[in-house]
Amino acid sequence: MIQSFTRLNVADNSGAKEIMCIKVLGGSHKRYASVGSVIVASVKKAIPNGKVKRGQVVKAVVVRTKKEIQRKNGSLVRFDDNAAVILDAKKDPVGTRIFGPVSREVRYANFMKIISLAPELYNEKRNQKK
């Protein structure tokens, strides 16, 4: 559950290290963002010579949350941190690498470029008897 003033880690190599959510996109009074939601954020910490600078306002998609997500099969998925990937105007990632696992819900939000760059897609496999 991401809301205004929530600080998130950045899971790509765009140059930003930490961002702060300004607004959750997708409705006039949408309060919370979950995995796969697009937010408007401000860069709070950045490395020198990065693609984005400190204080810059960017759009980002949430890829991990501490708040658990309930899947259709009944399982709950949660992560150790809140993380996002910074997007450009065409909703493609600014960075060329993604760090850490990415939740499967990002695929349902049609961010296929992020899925293809992710080193690990958190995809729970249930034990099924044959």
Swiss-Prot record:
GO function term, MF aspect, one: structural constituent of ribosome
CC per GO annotation: cytosolic large ribosomal subunit
Coiled-coil regions, chain positions: none
Annotated GO biological process: translation
Keyword S-adenosyl-L-methionine recorded: no
Keyword line: Ribonucleoprotein, Ribosomal protein, RNA-binding, rRNA-binding
Entries under Gene3D superfamilies matching the protein: Ribosomal protein L14 (2.40.150.20)
InterPro entries on file: Ribosomal_uL14, Ribosomal_uL14_bac-type, Ribosomal_uL14_CS, Ribosomal_uL14_sf
Reported function: Binds to 23S rRNA. Forms part of two intersubunit bridges in the 70S ribosome.
Family, as annotated: Belongs to the universal ribosomal protein uL14 family.
HAMAP family (alphabetical): Ribosomal_uL14
Subunit structure of this chain's protein: Part of the 50S ribosomal subunit. Forms a cluster with proteins L3 and L19. In the 70S ribosome, L14 and L19 interact and together make contacts with the 16S rRNA in bridges B5 and B8.
Official protein name in the record: Large ribosomal subunit protein uL14
Organism: Helicobacter pylori (strain P12)
Chain's gene name: rplN
